[in-house]
């Protein structure tokens, strides 16, 4: 429902580049104009296929980067929040998954009652007068947008948490659904959430996966990720979990380089490096 490809942690990207990696940061279609599976998931799976089919290398060469080659044996997926879920979605129901996945506090375990439970700390931010005829204008957006300048917790592209702009139907719609425990029914209406839940879709042979999650997360509680890791272990998938003390949701956008949080979350990227470094 929210976000765009510019809303990333620049220090994290710089860390990836320093490791000699090529970083691709896509936009995708936003719910609810299209559902989760047929919009964001499909778009990211198409991107993965494009990389494997030589599209990325061809694009780089067209940009004058003829000396750059793409090692398709070392493709990895990384994302935060909804992007963490999308990274995980590349591990199943695709012809060729990535080598490894790094999930930062991604949305998972959709059968848990949390996903239909109202969130008072979000509801208290909603102003009066958000009538359906206003917030439902989000369904009139044509074409389906791929860009929203605010994140799940109201963070702007700078990483500052200024809060949503409720004069915009999309912001009002998204935060109303979050506040009332209706995110999944709004973004995957009339469908079985088990179709898209990584907890339900993990199978033997799933890519090696690292999960990084803030212990104080109120938007996607850490116990949801713990269940994912439990299932990964049960299926024999190589995995690791990094629990970051004192951090709430979307902490990656505001952390300071060199802080305890910075050093802890880097273990996720170290995990990726270990996996792709194997012969």
Describe these PLM feature segments.
Residues 1-279:
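Alpha/beta-hydrolase superfamily serine-hydrolase fold, recognizing
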